[in-house]
Amino acid sequence: MDGTVTLSPAPTDLPPVSSLDAGQPTLPPEAPLAMPEQSLREGSLQVRHQRTSPMGIGLRRFYLIGGTLTATAVAVWVMLSVLWPGGFSVLEGCLLGLFVLLFAWIAMSFASAVAGFITVVARAGRKLGIDPDAPLPSLHTRTALLMPTYNEDPRRLLAGLQAIYESVAETGQLEHFDFFVLSDTTREHIGRAEEQVYAELCDSVGGHGRIFYRRRADNAARKAGNVADWVRRFGGNYPQMLILDADSVMTGDTIVRLVAGMEDNPDVGLIQTLPAVVNGQTLFARMQQFGGRVYGPIIAFGVAWWHGAESNYWGHNAIIRTQAFADHAGLPSLRGRKPFGGHVLSHDFVEAALMRRGGWAMHMVPYLQGSYEEGPPTLTDLLVRDRRWCQGNLQHAKVVGAKGLHWISRMHMMIGIGHYFTAPMWGMLMLVGIGIPLAGAGIDLAQGLPFSPARYWHGSSDGNAIWIFVCTMFVLLAPKLLGYIALLLNPRERRACGGAIRAALSILLETVLAALMAPVVMYLQSRGVFEVLAGKDSGWDAQVRDDGKLSWPALIRSYGGLSVFGLFMGTLAYLVSPSLAAWMAPVIVGMVVSIPVVAVTSLRRTGLALRRAGIFCIPEELDPPKVLVRASELRRAAALEPPLI
């Protein structure tokens, strides 16, 4: 695997080279790699301490866990001072248990965000000799860029790939790269369109013999199976593979630096970038990409700081050592029926864990810019994707106990599982918090006695309940505050986000909109958890990439029941006590207005109006990199062509 293999151009009129392929593939000679299925019942951790692990990684993790436990212990002690006087009921015990778990959850995020903030402000955390400001290194090995696709618009898809191809060519090192479109498309008319657009792309850029296309006849194991099929057939020609998503765009500069990082660090198995979300047009997409651009680095630098050489894999915009992947990332089929059994859905976490078990270092480089993706245009589209992620993360319950995994790899999976269980836990915490004063007050609903949860909690603890609420909200919102402070300290980023005042207004509006959507997300994530536990499979559909166009009937079908439930609960609370209704208002209002909120945030004109006002601006809009400009030009031109699908 010295990267010296030369690929000869493949004619475009060849029949399928394998019974594994459908349609008319155009492929290089095969160079198979064995990719054995890994056992979850056997195995051992090959290397405990990686050479590339940062100094003091043990102290970093001690800070994270120790800080989380200390903050949680203090909060629990104060909560006990609220609950203990006058006895300790079953409901209060439930409240305390939920509070411990949820406060520990947000305390860990807070501790990680603080570390990320310090790293960002200090401009530290650079790894593996990858310096974005240094001259572009020269490469010595071959790398394959893989773009899996599933029932996507081929013109839109290959416009992004063409922009990447041209950007790599501008580095002067195109000879070190080949590009593969790996289709799992099941709709025949889309498959034929893919072949046509692929041929047009090769003619346009002179990519024959360097850009290849393959569609699987059987798309078993979804994306993981798609990539594994390529590794088993062609991986021997390429020491590295860079995995893209259908909406991924990366600069040639960033790609070259990633490859050089792999060449210079032979014990590194994977390098994950931090993709910036771009090209949002709707209000929802723009608030998401603004939040990711301002708060995202704080969170990403924080986790990279304590992950060290045991980082995670997000499934795309990452470079992987092909041999290491083949040797250790062959996924087994999980025992049992769907949704917990069968093929591994959230394969990226598991592949990273197995590669780390095999002795390879896994790193994240959040400081390396030039990596981009797109977000869902509407809350509805986000929640559809989130339902699939929910099933994939809960499925990790069957993997987390696998033999030989590094404890940080297990922690990644537990965090993924916990993310979805926090939604029903927040709902239960709210209900129990209301139920305790209701039970203690002995309410007679027929008389409609005056009742105030706020007064109950405040009076029972000399204000400690209010103190807990304030501290909880501070810990919850701290990443936003830290992201804003970091933005203020970076003049270029601050100007690119509209300036200090507009950025502050953007954060305020994003926080309000997120609060209004939170009850909807909490309800649907909770429903997703219960559906998975009840055995309901999420399926696999193509994602919506362009602006959402949600009809009112669709909105009513999706959120009408939640709105009616919110009205019912609000009315019932008001009949008990207006103060109780006021206490529940933050949740009830979000439920009641879910239809108009989702409708307004799904509009392109709303998002663009705020952009003109300088709200939710990101640096990639003020000074877009050439690769994004080119991708947008190509996609606009493609949109003018006669439709193929």
Curated annotation (Swiss-Prot):
Sequence segments annotated as region (Disordered): 1-28
UniProt-listed InterPro entries: Glucans_biosynth_gluTrFase_H, Glyco_trans_2-like, Glycosyltr_2/OpgH_subfam, Nucleotide-diphossugar_trans
TM stretches of this protein: 64-84, 98-118, 423-443, 465-485, 504-524, 558-578, 580-600
Keywords linked to the UniProt accession: Cell inner membrane, Cell membrane, Glycosyltransferase, Membrane, Transferase, Transmembrane, Transmembrane helix
Name of this chain's protein: Glucans biosynthesis glucosyltransferase H
Gene Ontology annotations of biological process type: glucan biosynthetic process
Pfam families in alphabetical order: Glyco_trans_2_3
Single Gene Ontology MF annotation: hexosyltransferase activity
CDD domains for this protein: Glucan_BSP_MdoH
Broad class of the protein's primary localization: membrane
GO cellular component, one term: plasma membrane
Entry's EC annotation: 2.4.1.-
Pathway annotation: Glycan metabolism; osmoregulated periplasmic glucan (OPG) biosynthesis
Homology family: Belongs to the glycosyltransferase 2 family. OpgH subfamily.
Lipid bilayer topology: Multi-pass membrane protein
Keyword Iron-sulfur: no
Function: Involved in the biosynthesis of osmoregulated periplasmic glucans (OPGs).
Subcellular location: Cell inner membrane
NCBIfam families: PRK05454.1-3, PRK05454.1-4, PRK05454.2-1, PRK05454.2-5
Gene3D superfamilies: Spore Coat Polysaccharide Biosynthesis Protein SpsA, Chain A (3.90.550.10)
